[in-house]
């Protein structure tokens, strides 16, 4: 049996991610290029120890998604180990720079963005390089 819903498509999507308790906030739902800041996608922190897959074409936000997850896990006190061959995530060690684009994005998505640095330890798979050698 199907029922008609007066909720917007973004709200219908967000309803599937409506969780209580500690959760990671992945952000606002975007439908056809329109952001609904009241429709938030969340993952319960207790389920983050399970397997997951983040897939997509180049430029679709996979690395940014991993960064957001790592930042929120760090904030929650959960240690994170990430392999970053291309060096895309090394910026986690420094607070981001606020600018008009980040301010507008935070407004559009309903986020309260504050530049934050996170604890980072760099490891290296050899004896050369900047990181602590692993072997």
Please tell me what each predicted stretch does.
Residues 1-57, 64-76, 80-81, 86-125:
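Basic- and hydrophobic-enriched, low-structure N-terminal and domain-boundary segments
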Residues 120, 128-135:
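Short, intrinsically disordered, charge-balanced linker/junction segments flanking boundaries
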